[in-house]
Amino acid sequence: MTISPPESGEKNKKVLEDPVKADPRPIDFAKLDKPGFWSTKLSKGPKTTTWIWNLHADAHDFDVHTGDAEEATRKIFSAHFGHLAVIFIWMSAAFFHGARFSNYSGWLADPTHVKPGAQQVWAIVGQEMLNADLGANYNGIQISSGIFHMWRAWGITNESELMALAIGAVVMAALMLHAGIFHYHKAAPKMEWFQDIESMLNHHIAGLVGLGSLAWAGHCIHIGAPTAALLDAIDAGSPLVINGKEIATIADMPMPHQLCDPQIIGQIFPGLASGTGNFFSLNWLAFSDFLTFKGGLNPVTGSLWMTDVSHHHLAFGVIAIIGGHMYRTNYGIGHSMKEILDSQQGDPILFPAPKGHQGLFEFMAESRHAQLAVNLAMLGSISILVSHHMYAMPPYPYIATDYMTVLGLFTHHMWIGGLFIVGAGAHAGIAMVRDYDPAKHIDNVLDRILKARDALISHLNWVCMWLGFHSFGLYIHNDTMRALGRPQDMFSDSAIQLQPIFAQWVQSIQASAVGTSLLAGTAEALPHKALSEVFNGSLVEVGGKVAIAPIPLGTADLMIHHIHAFQIHVTVLILLKGVLYARSSRLIPDKASLGFRFPCDGPGRGGTCQVSSWDHVFLALFWMYNCLSIVIFHFSWKMQSDVWGLTGGNFAQSSITINGWLRDFLWAQASQVLTSYGQSISMYGLMFLGAHFIWAFSLMFLFSGRGYWQELFESIVWAHNKLKVAPTIQPRALSITQGRAVGVTHFLVGGIATTWAFFHARLFGLG
């Protein structure tokens, strides 16, 4: 890809003196109206049906539009604003449904008995069956997004506030759309502005993250926490009194702007009304009533304390603002990313790379795919961490006792994390093919890793086989012993124990640290509630339901965790092989010249199919799907069995055999979705069937070759010609790569929607 050279006279200018180019691409509607306008070939219009597939494949592949890195970067930057606009429209729709069609007020008044609903189905051909009685005189579809719980945490107390948010989000969407057009067509940043890494880090860390977190802390402190205190007191049956008036219902509560009145807020949090004098005199203890470190869960709501959440965002915002200023920008002080990387040398014994990290700064700064790969890997990992925190540290009021929401958010964040991590492998592969120049990376760490790729992949392959045979072998052994009537010879907590001693040790050191200074790192003892209850803590019950409880680990957990390890390692093996062998291999030394995606190395070279970096991503998606299916099945059964008390604690003895998973999890828990007809959850029965069909439909694309279909099309076209209705656009069978793309998409969508229906019908069906 070419890099646009600086314009004449600009080389000596500082980036921030003239960061944009005015009117680089005037809007040309005649051009934009033409599908495929970026390509001379596609813009001529379709001659065969392959045209529509190429249009989809290349529409967002900005690299191939012009080959100019600056132009591609501007398109990415502009597209970010478009993405934000879509997000704001989506948020607006959620707020609007909450304002007009939901039972938010009814749920807010009685969150332990009323179920959240935000949509009512019209009676056209009997769909009113789907409207369940959710309580508080409301019939509608039960939702499990956690959005009501989040709104309560924000401090939203009525539908008028939701409507204001809906309007505000639409306005923000319009602003974002305008910004996207403006920063591409009217004032587009120059390449030097995008490459000013230290300034970018400064603004992103201190500005977006730091000030964003600080602003949110302000909302939590002034609106969220006081509202939560009033609502919690109502729910606990001991309402607060403000100005001599008992706040017994939501209707009695002060308006949000009134909470900023020191006279009113001082009756909820005296420290909040004490003014800024305490801040500047460093008497910060005066603020300890609304900036707390209580730990544990609020016993009324089963969620983190809002005052703890406020404290967290304040502290994080301050840290990010300080951290964002450690890079060298205008004043010649601070860190230079290039200097840091260039000075990092490889270990001379373990990892001898004479040139260390030299060249990495330029590669990361110039390759958008390399940046995206790193960001996707990190964001995917963060998403998986979020999924675990949703049950271990429930952030929103009453969310912990809404079991379908807990399971739904866990599943959602696991899928998102998995897709992002596979995306990281995809864009790392593209970076290697399109952006990596071997001549610039001689004897640095990237070069050394590529030279050691055979050792890395063969060892990783050995690890995968070891984990796969041993972990699956434990299950096969147990199934065999149970079939032969020899329970004493099974791996279980009551026979041959395989206790997860390291995981149990981690749990115990967390619990034993309470009352000591072991983990806190200070002389002050760790308070009793500073740790999640899942670490050998105590049970918290809200409204007669378990919100959180200790999660015991045993032989069954060790066995399934080794299945997780096996599947994660295989997914990584496929992705890593796709990256390390993206440019060349012993089989195809000139792979880089074939590009990121190609079906085979041309006719006449057998055995060279499915070797492109794209094909590795294709295969990794299946392993990612299987891996996460087992993860979410494990979580669902474990929580129902050992925490929520829904299956009588059968996980430890039933999940140690393959038959147990099939009989006591899949079959037993599918009873709700299979018998859902005639009930409000009947749409999940239909979805279960339909999603199975979509999944099965994928096999048609994955198992058959294009020749079969082209042969069929030829005879169908012949029949059309006979009838004088032949199409002007010539039918073409999908290419090998297109068929795989359509196949894996239907496989994933069908599988995910099947699981969606299975989980929802199960927990909604149990009530």
UniProtKB/Swiss-Prot annotation:
[4Fe-4S] cluster binds at C600, C609. InterPro entries: PSI_PsaA (IPR006243), PSI_PsaA/B (IPR001280), PSI_PsaA/B_CS (IPR020586), PSI_PsaA/B_sf (IPR036408). Its main location: membrane. Residues 1-22 are annotated as: Disordered. One of its GO terms (biological process) is photosynthesis. Residues 8-22 have a biased composition (Basic and acidic residues). It catalyses: reduced [plastocyanin] + hnu + oxidized [2Fe-2S]-[ferredoxin] = oxidized [plastocyanin] + reduced [2Fe-2S]-[ferredoxin]. It is a multi-pass membrane protein. Divinylchlorophyll a' binds at H692. Keywords: 4Fe-4S, Chlorophyll, Chromophore, Electron transport, Iron, Iron-sulfur, Magnesium, Membrane, Metal-binding, Oxidoreductase, Photosynthesis, Photosystem I, Thylakoid, Transmembrane, Transmembrane helix, Transport. The keyword Electron transport applies. One of its GO terms (cellular component) is plasma membrane-derived thylakoid membrane. Gene3D superfamilies: Photosystem I PsaA/PsaB. The chain crosses the membrane at residues 76-99, 162-185, 201-225, 309-327, 368-391, 407-433, 455-477, 558-576, 616-637, 681-703, 741-761. PSI electron transfer chain: 5 divinyl chlorophyll a, 1 divinyl chlorophyll a', 2 phylloquinones and 3 4Fe-4S clusters. PSI core antenna: 90 divinyl chlorophyll a, 22 carotenoids, 3 phospholipids and 1 galactolipid. P700 is a divinyl chlorophyll a/divinyl chlorophyll a' dimer, A0 is one or more divinyl chlorophyll a, A1 is one or both phylloquinones and FX is a shared 4Fe-4S iron-sulfur center. Divinyl chlorophyll a binds at M700, Y708. Its EC number is 1.97.1.12. It is an enzyme of class 1 (oxidoreductase). Belongs to the PsaA/PsaB family. PsaA and PsaB bind P700, the primary electron donor of photosystem I (PSI), as well as the electron acceptors A0, A1 and FX. PSI is a plastocyanin/cytochrome c6-ferredoxin oxidoreductase, converting photonic excitation into a charge separation, which transfers an electron from the donor P700 chlorophyll pair to the spectroscopically characterized acceptors A0, A1, FX, FA and FB in turn. Oxidized P700 is reduced on the lumenal side of the thylakoid membrane by plastocyanin or cytochrome c6. This is Photosystem I P700 chlorophyll a apoprotein A1. The gene is psaA.
